[in-house]
Design a protein with these regions (language model features):
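Alpha-helical transmembrane segments and their helix-helix packing motifs
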Residues: 2-177
Length: 177
């Protein structure tokens, strides 16, 4: 269900306080565009922008410009209705591509000193946090899964967990080896 996205990000209480219905429209709005949700994409982009603004003296100058452009793009796209089903995939693909561009830019231009170390620690902590959330979600689905539903359900669930964490390619390469 769509609500699993809210649960995955520990936003159940915040969601329930603002929305009565657990449907696609509300979940997408809450997770991407709700400026009162501290974990929404829009709030996260604004926080990254603010963090870069306050650390401009130690971060590459263009990183600030790139995140500023991405934040402006996201806000304008949301105003223009990009959360609708027909436009959402293209919008999220653009956001993902811009995030990867920013990550790559910082990784290739930041001096490898204590600032680099802190940036790497933050990236690794965020990755570990998201990985444990995805694993928790997969484990929960398996624990509540009725064995009579489908014999291959565990394989499908773990395949989805691997894809969600971007680990499916590495898994296939190692299993095939």
């Amino acid at each position: 269900s769509w609500f699993n996205l809210v649960t995955l990000n520990s936003g159940d209480a915040e969601y329930e306080a603002r929305y009565k219905v657990r449907d696609e429209r509300n979940v997408v709005k809450f997770t991407l565009a709700d400026d009162t949700n501290s974990g929404s994409m829009l709030v996260s982009l604004s926080m990254v922008r603010e963090n870069l603004r306050t650390t401009r003296d130690v971060m590459p100058e263009s990183a600030w410009e790139l995140i500023n452009e991405l934040t402006t793009f996201a806000k304008q796209s949301i105003k223009d209705g990009c959360l609708n089903r027909g436009k959402r995939h293209e919008f999220l693909t653009q956001v993902t591509n811009q995030c990867q561009l920013i990550q790559g830019y910082i990784a290739s231009t930041l001096s490898h000193d204590e600032v680099w170390d802190m940036w790497c620690i933050g990236r690794h902590l965020e990755c570990a946090d998201m990985t444990t959330r995805i694993l928790d979600a997969g484990t929960h689905v398996l624990a509540t899964h009725d064995d009579r539903d489908e014999a291959h359900a565990p394989l499908i669930i773990w395949g989805n967990v691997l894809r969600s964490s971007g680990a499916d390619h590495a898994y296939r390469r190692n299993v095939a080896a």
